[in-house]
């Protein structure tokens, strides 16, 4: 399943998101959700042991001036790769 997070993590039920993550899922951070990808962020730390891949939209990272602060554990994707993710994961959950 592809989970998308367009909001800062404190504005959603992040513990529920963590509970619903399954092996092989992906989490795509976009809009204000890219703040989760900042190195040392407590929400990112809680994702470290999850059996998923965390992606963040490059355009939203750049728009917020966060390029140098994003963790190396997060895969940066552009809009084309975003579309590929939506095709790869038939099921999606927006937070």
Curated annotation (Swiss-Prot):
What SUPFAM superfamilies does its record include?
DsrEFH-like
Q: Which InterPro entries match?
A: DsrEFH-like, Sulphur_relay_TusB, Sulphur_relay_TusB/DsrH
The Gene Ontology biological process annotation of the record reads: tRNA wobble position uridine thiolation
A cellular-component GO term for this protein: sulfurtransferase complex
The alphabetical list of record keywords is: Cytoplasm, tRNA processing
Entry's localization field: Cytoplasm
Query: Which domain of life does the UniProt lineage start with?
Result: Bacteria
> Family assignment?
Belongs to the DsrH/TusB family.
What is the protein's quaternary organization?
Heterohexamer, formed by a dimer of trimers. The hexameric TusBCD complex contains 2 copies each of TusB, TusC and TusD. The TusBCD complex interacts with TusE.
Q: Which HAMAP family match?
A: Thiourid_synth_B
Function field: Part of a sulfur-relay system required for 2-thiolation of 5-methylaminomethyl-2-thiouridine (mnm(5)s(2)U) at tRNA wobble positions.
* Cross-referenced NCBIfam families: PRK13510.1, sulf_tusB_dsrH
- Output this protein's name: Protein TusB
Which organism's genome codes for this protein? Salmonella arizonae (strain ATCC BAA-731 / CDC346-86 / RSK2980)
Q: Which gene encodes it?
A: tusB
